[in-house]
């Protein structure tokens, strides 16, 4: 659950090795907010408020993703994904979209660098609205602009990362990573804000004990926000995580925004992975 339970993020995937150097996967993602009150018919024809006329709907994004990855040599790996996106808000707004992501990782000794280019061709979403006569009348009477069918573009984003692995003793490791999101859609409220490029840095670490227990922590979402006096200050979002791997079954938990340090609400994230051919 994201943002103190307001939104729900569901993810599932299956991955199959094609050979010793390549694999293919299929993933499904749903991110949505459910039980949103629809008050467009709250007031009846006589001008009376009738709460029984309130209905509820969901606003959700669905993604169907096919991915392929290949190990080029002992140091370099490359991969890519094709995604089909379905977005909807109740029965009155729907969109279909298409996008492509590519990535590459280079590792040598205990160092590594990685790059992910998301929405490299820009992701296209074609919106179609089907409003009832009651909704159109409500929009007009309240001075709201009627939505129009159109095309939504998600511009490319590049994620650059560098990581270092430290080995303290046999099967005990510490991995430290620094990465940055580079967006291309104009000025954003991030640490380095510009037009058209903005840079949002993150740092994280994972303590690995015998590939059985994983302790994780990190910082990100650095933003400039007003405090109680109206003075602009920088806020940062701390996150913690725990992972357990037992005989090919991995259980992961993460808690974001520890102590409500940033302007965002906290999120609880659970995931599990089953390896059908554990080594």
Describe each PLM feature range.
Residues 1-279:
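Subset of outer-membrane beta-barrel
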């Amino acid at each position: 659950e994201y943002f103190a339970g307001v939104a729900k993020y569901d993810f599932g995937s299956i991955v199959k090795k094609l050979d010793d150097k390549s694999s293919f996967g299929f993933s499904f993602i749903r991110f949505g907010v459910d039980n949103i009150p629809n008050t467009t018919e709250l007031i009846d024809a006589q001008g009376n408020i009738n709460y029984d006329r309130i209905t509820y709907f969901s606003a959700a994004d669905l993604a169907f993703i096919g991915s392929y990855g290949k190990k080029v040599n002992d140091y370099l790996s490359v991969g890519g994904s094709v995604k089909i996106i379905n977005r909807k808000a109740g029965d009155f707004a729907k969109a279909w979209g298409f996008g492509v992501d590519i990535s590459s990782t280079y590792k040598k000794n205990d160092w590594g660098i990685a790059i992910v280019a998301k929405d490299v061709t820009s992701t296209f979403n074609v919106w179609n609205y089907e409003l009832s006569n009651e909704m159109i009348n409500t929009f007009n009477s309240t001075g709201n602009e009627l939505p129009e069918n159109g095309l939504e573009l998600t511009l490319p984003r590049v994620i650059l990362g560098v990581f270092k692995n430290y080995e303290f003793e046999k099967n005990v490791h510490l991995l430290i990573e620094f990465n940055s999101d580079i967006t291309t859609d104009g000025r954003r409220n991030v640490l380095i804000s510009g037009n058209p490029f903005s840079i949002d840095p993150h740092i994280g670490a994972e303590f690995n004990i015998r590939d059985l227990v994983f302790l994780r922590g990190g910082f990100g979402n650095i933003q400039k926000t007003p405090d109680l006096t109206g003075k602009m200050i920088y806020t940062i979002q701390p996150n913690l995580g725990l992972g357990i791997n037992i005989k090919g079954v991995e259980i992961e938990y993460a808690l974001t925004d520890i102590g409500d340090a940033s302007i965002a609400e906290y999120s609880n994230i659970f995931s599990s992975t089953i390896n059908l051919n554990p080594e």
